[in-house]
Amino acid sequence: MITSPLLAYVAILFFCVLKASSLDTFIAAVYEHAAILPDAPLTPVSHEEALMLMNRNLDLLEGAVTSAAKQGAHIIVTPEDGVYGFFFSRESIYSYLEDIPDPHVNWIPCTNPSRFGHTPVQKRLSCLARDNSIYIVANIGDKKPCNASDPDCPHDGRYQYNTDVVFDSEGRLVARYHKQNLFLGEDQFDAPKEPEIVTFDTTFGRFGIFTCFGILFHDPAVTLVKDFQVDTILFPTAWMNVLPHLTAIEFHSAWAMGMRVNFLAANIHFPLRKMTGSGIYAPDSPRAFHYDMKTKEGKLLLSQLDSHPHRPAVNWTSYASGLPTPLVGNQEFKSTVFFDEFTFLELKGVAGNYTVCQKDLCCQLSYRMLEKREDEVYALGAFDGLHTVEGSYYLQICTLLKCKTMDLHSCGDSVETASTRFEMFSLSGTFGTQYVFPEVLLSDIQLAPGEFQVSSDGRLFSLKPPSGPVLTVTLFGRLYERDSASGASADLVAQGLRVMLGVIITIMYSLSW
């Protein structure tokens, strides 16, 4: 019979061993991969031909994994679509898919590759992780048969999922995530019936995973942080940059800061589709990032992160709500930012305090420029409404931005360079949400690590003069509970815009091949 003192001793010993094996910091790696694409992605090929292409991409990923492991990385994230590319049909993607089991089966494909059928891609990823003693995050395709007993079963008798997989340092499959929020043009894949919440624990923290477009929605992204207390998000993506507020490095670093977690973003590298921008982001500042529209090369990033980052919560409306309500003046004007109509005020002096409102949101800006240039216009904008283009999601945004030209109606158009330097800025707003993501983007699409901070009362302010001219300073708020609060007319407009955007994206794809 085991006595209770002995049980207590064993429990204490186990706790001590567990604590001794845990790491306060770890080295993260992300790889922006320039994928080798199929010549004719809409044409079905044999599994052998598909595997040849995937192995060519895996050869490149192997080089990145090996290099990262030699530099001490504990985990590496690779991009969405990185193994086979994109723009497939439902039929043409099929030869690239494998059956990916639930990780609870406790499977190491490297040592038992035939347990779940023919799985050469999973075997290779597993062996790569095992041989290099590193966690590997990859994006591949899953297939699951179904039949008429399932009323949702697709016409071809199978579900096809855009899938993230994670193999641990022994090559064991420890996580599988089926992408929930499919983007326009992803008709080759099905969305799972319910959002999947996928986490796994390591000696260097708890990890959660989701893919690309999902960052704009509550589930699973926010749920992973709020309800499952993950320390680090793993984020394979094929992200098309959209200025002024949705470039990859800008928004992903802002999400890390707003949600107060580490964020490892690996983007595909394909400048013809405006796809670039990867990074390793901590809650207080970016640790490493890469944005390159000029070359065709991939890029490996590494940086050290805290295993359990802890940042204080922010009251995003505290400061701005204490300010007097401004009178609506005749200097306001309207201009469109990514199909949304903002209310703007032009910044007319070298320094000043401005407030602009739209609906329930008032945005307050204090700033000082080094000089007021005659050839550039900056404006303070507010938007409080439902965005209905590539998806429906409710936004509250306060933004200081450079206008494309001297014409005020160009405020919100895409612009990549600026010349105006700021000495300081402080931006706040009366947000109706706790989910606000602070962005600072400098000329030539560069971040400003260590140059700004968010206060506990909701101000985004500069710590020193920014190191480059400012493109935008933005507080990007999400009101998830109002995403479906659209009327019939808004739905009709959204449907038309989605069709138009889908046609544009299809044309972009076809021109790329």
Swiss-Prot record:
The active site is at 80 (proton acceptor), 179 (proton donor), 212 (nucleophile). Its main location: membrane. Transmembrane segments: none annotated. A lipid is attached at residue 487 (GPI-anchor amidated glycine). Disulfide bonds: none annotated. GO terms for biological process: pantothenate metabolic process. Residues 1-22 form the signal peptide. It comes from the Eukaryota. GO terms for cellular component: plasma membrane; side of membrane. Glycans are attached at residues 147, 315, 353. Its EC number is 3.5.1.92. Detected in kidney (at protein level). CDD domains: biotinidase_like. Residues 40-307 form the CN hydrolase domain. One of its GO terms (molecular function) is pantetheine hydrolase activity. It is a lipid-anchor; GPI-anchor. Residues 488-513 form a propeptide. It is found in: Cell membrane. InterPro entries: Biotinidase-like_euk, Biotinidase/VNN, C-N_Hydrolase, C-N_Hydrolase_sf, Vanin_C. It catalyses: (R)-pantetheine + H2O = cysteamine + (R)-pantothenate. Keywords: Cell membrane, Glycoprotein, GPI-anchor, Hydrolase, Lipoprotein, Membrane, Signal. Amidohydrolase that hydrolyzes specifically one of the carboamide linkages in D-pantetheine thus recycling pantothenic acid (vitamin B5) and releasing cysteamine. Belongs to the carbon-nitrogen hydrolase superfamily. BTD/VNN family. Monomer. This is Pantetheinase.
